[in-house]
C-alpha cells in the first residue's frame, strides 16, 4: 500500500488538477491567451499522474469487491472472484511504483530543445562509420517522435563516415528523452574493411546539451571573437564562393564553435551563438551539480562523458545499456531509430533512483526535526 505521505502528495496534485480544470472554463482566463496557455500547460503536466491515481483507486475497489465475494455462498461467484483477483492483484504493486515515480521532481531542462554532438572516438575509419550510423539513428528517432532536426556542422571522414557532427533537435520535451544518450557508445562488429573477419571494437562519444535561451546565459559580445571562412564539403573542398561559415571563440573559456551549413553568414552566426550558449549553460549546470553533489558530475549516469554507457554487439545482434542493465536484440531496428524502449528503461531507472534519494532526504529531515 502507498504510504499516507505519498497519498497526501498525490491527492494534492489531484486537487490542483481540478482547480486548473475550473480555471480553463473561467471567461477571464479563456480571454487571456498567455494565461490560458500557462494554465493548460500546467494541467497537461499533471494529467497523467491524476489519471494513474484514479485508475489505482478503481483497481483497489475492484480488488476489495472481489475479496468480499470470496465469502459468498454461491460457489460460482467465489470461483469468478478468484479468477478476477488472480488478474487484479499483480497489478497493484506496479501501479503503486508508477505513482511514486510521478512524484519525482522534474528536471527543469526537460522541456528544452537540445544540441547533440557526435564524435568518432577510438577505432579509426570504423569509428567514423559508426558515428554516421549513430547520427542517422537519432535523426530517425526524431522523425518517429515528430521532432525537427537541423544539421549545424559536420566534418566528414573516410568511407562516408563522420569525424564529428552537431545537430539541433526541436520538439516536445526533447531533452527529457535524449539526455540519457550522453556518454560513450561502443560498437563491436567486423568492419567492412576487415579482410580476416575479426571483430573490432570502436567508440563514438555523444554529448546532449539543453538549448539555452538568452535569459539563461548572458554572453558579453566583447568576450566573443568571430572568424569567417568558406564552407567545405566532406572531402575538404570549398562548396561556397563567399565567406559564409562562422567560427566563434569564447575567450574567457576557450570554447570554439562553428557553423557552416547555411549559405547566409548571419544565419550561421545565429546558429553558432545558439551552440555557444548551450555549451556555457552546460558548464554552469555542471558547476551547480558538482556543488550539490560531488559524486554526480554529469547529466546522467555516474560520471562524465567518458563513461561507457552502451554496447552495440552486431555479431550477437544485441544492445546492452550498462547503466541500467538493459538488453535487447534486433540492432537493425535500433539503428533505424527504434530506441524508445531503451530510453524508457533509463528514464524509469533514474526516476526510481531520484525517488530513493528524495526519500532518504525526507527521512533525514524528519530525524533532524525529531
UniProtKB/Swiss-Prot annotation:
It is found in: Cytoplasm. Pfam families: PCRF, RF-1. The keyword Lipoprotein does not apply. Belongs to the prokaryotic/mitochondrial release factor family. Disulfide bonds: none annotated. Peptide chain release factor 1 directs the termination of translation in response to the peptide chain termination codons UAG and UAA. The modification N5-methylglutamine is found at residue 237. Keywords: Cytoplasm, Methylation, Protein biosynthesis. PANTHER family: LD18447P (PTHR43804:SF7). NCBIfam families: prfA, PRK00591.1. HAMAP family: Rel_fac_1. GO terms for cellular component: cytoplasm. One of its GO terms (molecular function) is translation release factor activity, codon specific. Residues 286-296 have a biased composition (Basic and acidic residues). It comes from the Bacteria. The gene is prfA. Methylated by PrmC. Methylation increases the termination efficiency of RF1. This is Peptide chain release factor 1. Coiled coil: none annotated. Residues 286-311 are annotated as: Disordered.
Amino acid at each position: 500500500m502507498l504510504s499516507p505521505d505519498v497519498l497526501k502528495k498525490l491527492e494534492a496534485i489531484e486537487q490542483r488538477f481540478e482547480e486548473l480544470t475550473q480555471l480553463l472554463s473561467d471567461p477571464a482566463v479563456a480571454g487571456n491567451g498567455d494565461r490560458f496557455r500557462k494554465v493548460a500547460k500546467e494541467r497537461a503536466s499533471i494529467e497523467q499522474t491524476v489519471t494513474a491515481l484514479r485508475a489505482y483507486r478503481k483497481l483497489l475497489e475492484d480488488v476489495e469487491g472481489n475479496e468480499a465475494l470470496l465469502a459468498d455462498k454461491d460457489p460460482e461467484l467465489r470461483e469468478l472472484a478468484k479468477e478476477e483477483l488472480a488478474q487484479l492483484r499483480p497489478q497493484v504493486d506496479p501501479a503503486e511504483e508508477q505513482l511514486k515515480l510521478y512524484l519525482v521532481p522534474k528536471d527543469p531542462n526537460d522541456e528544452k530543445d537540445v544540441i547533440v554532438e557526435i564524435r568518432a572516438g577510438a577505432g579509426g575509419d570504423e569509428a567514423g562509420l559508426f558515428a554516421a550510423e549513430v547520427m542517422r539513428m537519432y535523426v530517425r528517432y526524431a522523425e518517429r517522435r515528430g521532432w525537427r532536426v537541423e544539421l549545424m556542422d559536420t566534418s566528414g571522414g573516410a568511407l562516408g563516415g563522420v569525424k564529428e557532427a552537431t545537430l539541433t533537435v526541436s520538439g516536445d520535451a526533447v531533452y527529457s528523452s535524449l539526455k540519457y544518450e550522453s556518454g560513450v557508445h561502443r560498437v563491436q562488429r567486423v568492419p567492412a574493411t576487415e579482410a580476416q573477419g575479426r571483430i573490432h571494437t570502436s567508440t563514438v562519444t555523444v554529448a546532449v546539451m539543453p538549448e539555452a535561451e538568452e535569459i539563461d546565459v548572458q554572453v558579453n559580445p566583447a568576450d566573443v571573437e568571430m572568424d569567417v571562412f568558406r564552407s567545405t564539403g566532406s572531402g575538404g573542398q570549398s562548396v561556397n564562393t563567399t565567406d559564409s561559415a562562422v567560427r566563434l571563440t569564447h575567450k574567457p573559456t576557450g570554447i570554439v564553435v562553428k557553423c557552416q551549413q547555411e549559405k547566409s553568414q548571419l544565419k550561421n552566426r545565429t546558429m553558432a551563438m545558439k551552440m555557444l550558449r548551450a555549451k556555457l549553460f552546460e558548464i554552469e549546470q555542471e558547476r551547480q551539480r558538482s556543488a550539490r553533489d560531488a559524486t554526480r558530475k554529469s547529466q546522467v549516469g555516474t560520471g562524465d562523458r567518458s563513461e561507457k554507457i552502451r554496447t552495440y554487439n552486431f555479431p550477437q545482434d544485441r544492445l546492452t545499456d550498462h547503466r541500467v542493465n538493459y538488453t535487447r536484440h534486433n540492432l537493425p531496428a535500433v539503428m533505424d531509430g527504434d530506441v524508445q524502449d531503451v530510453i524508457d528503461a533509463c528514464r524509469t531507472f533514474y526516476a526510481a533512483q531520484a525517488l530513493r534519494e528524495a526519500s532518504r532526504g525526507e527521512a533525514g529531515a524528519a530525524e533532524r526535526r525529531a
